Amino acid sequence: MSTFILGATGLVGSQIVKVAESSPAIKSITTLTRRTPDFANSSSKLKTLEESDSSKWSEIIKSQAVSSDVYLSAFGTTRAKAGSAENFKKIDYGINYSSAKAAKENGSKVCVLVSSMGANASSPFLYMKTKGELEDDIIKLGFDHTVILRPGALLGERKESHGLGNSIAQTIGNWTKGTWLQGLLKPIDASDVGKVAIDFAQKGINGELKDKVIIVGGDDLVKLANSLN
């Protein structure tokens, strides 16, 4: 099985790479990042592509003839990091969608998208609305299987700040994990999201998924992660 991973230097994406590297079922891994990742040359089955201008990523996927069985994306940003609502949508929706479309056109059969708890195209909130619109439009691309993961507060060490809101959510998530309060934020370790993402990827290629579209919310994501640990 071959995989293509977008957002591989992020909190969840880097964990997806780690799990993929350790999986004997995965024979090749391709990543596309803005900068040289820490894991470059960490595995003989890993190929890293670099382009600082992410608006060119979809064309790189096409021109490099990157054809993988599974397309996984944990790519994303925040309004604070993007600088404006317009830039946020251009990055979080635009780059994600164009890259997924290119992967589909290149023959990827399964798509695993790491989205967010509360994603809804009808939401009045920019972040949730954009995530929901992205989900809807990626589903319309028509992969054999589209798996959408909606984690709650992500736990783990980030290399880059994603803004005060994310920092607060992560701190509270750490405090509430294992308590009755965890039902509010549904905290989950990024490494566990990585495990679930790769598990779904393998099941999709192996013909073990019955549904064409699978959306996994925070509670179910935690349960699935626990079953894999």
Swiss-Prot record:
Its main location: mitochondrion. SUPFAM superfamilies: NAD(P)-binding Rossmann-fold domains (SSF51735). Residues 1-36 form a transit peptide. One of its GO terms (cellular component) is mitochondrial outer membrane. One of its GO terms (biological process) is import into nucleus. Keywords: Membrane, Mitochondrion, Mitochondrion outer membrane, Transit peptide. Gene3D superfamilies: NAD(P)-binding Rossmann-like Domain. It comes from the Eukaryota. It is found in: Mitochondrion outer membrane. It holds the Pfam family HIM1. The keyword Ribosomal protein does not apply. It is a peripheral membrane protein. Belongs to the FMP52 family. This is Protein FMP52, mitochondrial. The lineage of its organism: Eukaryota, Fungi, Dikarya, Ascomycota, Saccharomycotina.
